[in-house]
Curated annotation (Swiss-Prot):
Pfam families the record matches: PfkB
Reactions that this protein is recorded to catalyse: myo-inositol + ATP = 1D-myo-inositol 3-phosphate + ADP + H(+)
Record-given protein name: Inositol 3-kinase
Transmembrane segments: none
E.C. code: 2.7.1.64
Native organism: Zea mays
Amino acid sequence: MPLAAEPDDAHEERENQQLLITTKGGPGLEGLVVGSYCHDVLIRGGRIVGETLGGAAAFVSNVLDAASPQGAALNETSPFVVVAKVGHDFIYARAPASARHPPLLCSSPTTSFHAQFSETAASAHAPDRELRRVRACDPIYPADLPDRRFAYGLAVGVAGEVLPETLEQMIRLCRTVLVDAQALIRAFDGDGAVGHVALGDTPYARLLPRVAFVKASSEEAPYVGVETTRRQCCVIVTEGRDGCRLYWDGGEAHVAPFPAVQVDPTGAGDSFLAGFAAGLLWGLSATDAALLGNFFGAAAVSQVGVPTFHPKMLQAVKEILEEKTRKRSSPCMNGASFTLEKSNMHNELHAALQEAAVLMSEQQQADPANGSGGDICSA
């Protein structure tokens, strides 16, 4: 699948080609993550059961730090930049994710969400929680982004903070752009309740041909319009315990899940998208990379808030990826096209990651209090 670019933007394409030349075989491909940190308050049965660092950028940076190939073995600085905004009331400045990637401070309060969890199990298209935005920080403007080229970008807004013009600037700066649908289609009523609008009716729709991947939950998929959007970019629909599906112009694929005991679904989709991006950085095809996305999505739901990954589990995952991927001087994140279909090692990769998932389960059993504090989602 070719990466789309405006045909008359010759200068932009020359800069992209220069990025390809300068990073090939170099120290790493720098990424750009755009989306704000939040205060998340988790409520069940009318009482607060958790207060955590939230915002897709926190979950995404957590997985990229853990799973990206660049610098992972050498303990180098993370090869990506996070642009997030918070207010002076931000209380998680010392949390690992936000400490590694400090946000921009502004005068408005930090974005805050209240998540009211249902007493009943969620269905395929019904949410297991009701979200309400109770405070909103300033949006992220194009001028807030670094003025340099990036190999890839992830637009992961949660409260409308990634403006259309900001996404367009990301597309100008980044060779490849991946977008979480929630950054594009969320709408908020007067009480802050989160709803959705059709992607085709938003100012973002015209940018889709220049985006490589859009990730949506099964609840968001009808608003994305999969059949229309797949003709412009690859659409990934996460289906929880059923794994995920990839749709592109002329093909589709189902990717199997990994078992998980769900404690808190917050951040599962964000962790999936970051795992998927990490898979592309390792040189996997899109469908193979979705296995890594499913793996980290499952890891995220087993803890409350931004998860902590056991070092043994991470080491096992890195060894699997090193064994299963070939050394490439130009990973597909920096190439001119993506391979979308499953490779001939897809099933082997899934089986190997299943074994790593056992380590994740053993960690949870050995230390059930690690980041959890009980099952928030069910009685």
